[in-house]
Amino acid sequence: MRIGLFTDTYFPQVSGVATSIRTLKEELEKQGHEVYVFTTTDKKVKRYEDPTIIRLPSVPFISFTDRRVVYRGLISSYKIAKQYKLELIHTQTEFSVGLLGKMVAAALRIPVVHTYHTQYEDYVEYIANGKLIKPSMVKYIVRGFLNDLDGVICPSRIVLNLLDDYHIKIPKRVIPTGIKLEDYLRDDISQKDIDSLRVDLGVANDETMLLSLSRISSEKNIQAVLSHFPEVLTENPKVKLVVVGDGPYSDDLKVLAKELDIESKVVFTGMVNHEDVAVYYRAADFFISASTSETQGLTYTESLASGTPVIAHGNPYLDDLIDDKMFGTLFYREEDLADAILDAIAETPVMDAKKHQEKLYTISAEHFGKSVYAFYLDVLISEKSKKKEKFSLTVKGSKTDRSIKLAKTAISLPSQAVKATAMTSVKVVKAPKHLIEIVRDFLD
C-alpha cells in the first residue's frame, strides 16, 4: 500500500507525536508498504534530505515557537501525492498540514484516516493566553475536522470516550502507540552501568529510586509529586526522586523543592542523551507520574519494557495498561499520591517473566504497525463497498432510476449560480495584489 502521513511535527522535533509517527512509518515500511511523510521544514535538517519526507515551507506557530505551521504547498503536495499514487492519507494534526492532507485526499478521491493525539482543552490557555480559543470551542473545531473523514485512530480509551462525548460518528478504533522494544531490552546495559549511574545520582543501594522523565511543564504535574514527597519521607526516609528532563517549569520545581526542604532527596538532571534513557529506566525502582493530561504517554510503556513498574495517576488508558500489581500502582486522587508510593514500595511483586513477555508484545512497535494497517484495510474495504452501492446498475424506468435522475437534476448547477460565480471571480481578480499573492503562495 502507498500511504501519505500528514503531520505538523516530525523528527528532529522532540515530542511523543513525532516519535509515534516515525515509529509508524518504520513499521509500515518493514511490512513492505511505501510511506511518505508530508511535514514542515526544519532548520536542523536539509529540506530534500530524504525523498520519502516532503518538507513544506513553514513558520513558527504563535505561542509554540518550537512547533511550525505550513503557509504554502497545496498544489505541490497534490502533484507529489498523485505522482506517488497514494492510496490512503493518514493525517496526524487538525491544523495546517492536516487540513492540507484532507484537501489532497479529496482531490485524489482517496480515503483519509486520522489519529487524534492531543486533548486541546489542556493547552488552549497557551494560545494567545486563552483569548483566541476557549475550551468550550474545542469540540466544535474537532467535530468540524473529523466528521467527513473515513476513520479515526484513538491512542487510548481516554480519546475514544472524548470523541464519543464530541458526538464524532465516523468509525473509531483504539490503537495505542507501540515502542521499539530493542531500545530498552538492551544487552549492552550491564549491572555495572546501572550501579554506576545510581552512584553518580547519589542514590544508595538501600534507597528506592523514583524516576520522573518528561518535558518539564506545569501540565506534567511534577509539582504534585514534590508536594507530597515530604509525607513519603516521613514514613520512609530511604527514597530519592530523580527528575530527568528540561522545560519552562524547571526553575519553579527547584524553588518548590527548596521551600519544602527536600533538596537533598530530589535530583534534577536536566536533559539526558536519548541513548542513556534506557539506563535511567533500568536504574530506577519505579517510574512515577502525576500527569492528568496524557492521552497515552509513551514513558509508561518505555518503563514497562525496561522491567520497571509504574506509579501513576489512573485513567482509562492506564487501567488497561497496568492490569496487574507487578506492572504498577495507580492512584485516582492527588491526596492519595503519598500512600500510593508507600504501597508500591511495600507491595509490588517481582515481575513474572511470562506475563512480562506477553505485555511486551502488546506495547511493541510491531503490534502497533500491524494494528494500524488492519484499520487501513477495513477503511479501504468500506470505501470500496460505498462506491459499489453508489455506482450499482439500475433498471431503466424503475423507482431507483427515477431517483437517480432526480438527484442529477438536484445537483445540476442553475445558470443563475454560474453567473453569480462568474461575478465572484471578477471580484477576486480585483482583490488587492498582496491578498492574491498570499493565496497563490499557499496553492503553489
List PLM regions with ranges.
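Short hydrophobic beta-strand element within catalytic cores of glycosyltransferases
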Residues: 309-312
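Donor nucleotide-sugar binding/catalytic pocket of nucleotide-sugar-dependent glycosyltransferases
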Residues: 39, 54-57, 135, 140-193
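Short alpha-helical donor nucleotide-sugar binding micro-motif in glycosyltransferases
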Residues: 81, 269-272, 279-284
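Aromatic "clamp/platform" in nucleotide-sugar-dependent glycosyltransferases that forms part
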Residues: 292
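Conserved donor-binding/catalytic core segment of Leloir-type glycosyltransferases
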Residues: 204-220, 226-229
